[in-house]
A protein has these predicted regions:
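Short, P/G- and charge-enriched loop/turn segments at secondary-structure junctions
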Residues: 124-131
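Functional-site microenvironments in short loops/helix caps that host divalent-cation chemistry
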Residues: 2-122, 134-136
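Short, structured beta-strand segments at or near domain termini in extracellular proteins/domains
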Residues: 136-150
Length: 151
């Protein structure tokens, strides 16, 4: 699907640059400090329970958000449906697995480094820094950080 976050579906196909820019934009709109989670934040929010859309049950497509069981912290879709950007000491990565990931690989062990093939069919020249034409399995989760907002 190319819903890009509309109609209750996860926002997909965005590059790390686009995800970071969205967080900055949303921060200024809400006067809150919003960011992509660090890998440590993501791991703290991830528990081994809760539902997940994966290769064996997703029928080759993303699904509306919050349609599986939440984890014990009450957070939906931490694993599966779409992989999520996190920041690491080695740069941005995609974690959690997606609707294309086998069930046994869903979770924190599914950690991907972005590759050029995620944008191979982008018709723009130069290729877009904002979206990945071939990475409909990459999405975004945001973190609202405590403290004062700084532009």
């Amino acid at each position: 699907d190319r819903g890009f976050g509309r109609s209750g579906y996860p926002a997909i196909s965005m590059s790390a640059q686009a995800a970071e820019s969205f967080c900055k934009w949303l921060s200024t709109r809400t006067n809150q400090t919003i960011s992509i989670p660090t890998i440590e934040q993501w791991n703290s929010a991830n528990t081994s329970d809760g539902g997940a859309w994966h290769k064996w049950n997703a029928d080759k497509s993303t699904h509306p958000i919050a349609t599986t069981k939440p984890n014990s912290l009450g957070i939906y879709d931490m694993r599966g449906n779409v992989g999520e950007w996190v920041t690491t000491k080695d740069g941005p990565r995609v974690i959690g697995g997606s609707f294309r990931t086998p069930a046994e690989e869903i979770g924190p062990s599914s950690l991907l480094t972005p590759i050029k093939d995620w944008n191979i069919t982008d018709p723009q020249l130069p290729r877009s820094p904002w979206w990945f034409a071939d990475a409909d399995f990459v999405g975004l989760r945001i973190v609202i950080n405590e403290g004062d907002f700084n532009e």
